[in-house]
Amino acid sequence: MAQIKIYGIAERLVPVREALSDAIHSCVVEALQFPPDKRAHRFFPLDRANFFIPGGQGRTDRYTIIEISLFEGRTVEARKHLIRLLFERVQAAAQISPADLEITLTETPRHNWGFRGQSGDEIGLNYKVDV
């Protein structure tokens, strides 16, 4: 399971929302072997006044943050592969350069998740976590 949050300046984020979601999802499906129907993305388009962009490093008003919460268990290689794919595909799909993209992966134990009325470690999944 993964929950994905995407933050950016509204006038930059909203026009690319669909393409960005498709790019992110393709990365998760490939790198983490998620089923194609497992897409949980939430977009947070912010007013410029509510989104401070770190200076330097070539950042622009396209600066975007992707936060991915997921079950623990993926290998370091799988997580790094996901990050590499995100930098590549987000740039191609949404014209957000690697300098403008920040990615955070946060893993937690399955027992810290609750969905479908149960604790995450009690639910049978139709995909592997240990990739």
Which positions does each model-derived feature cover?
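A domain-level signal for the structural core that forms small-molecule/cofactor-binding pockets
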Residues: M1-V131
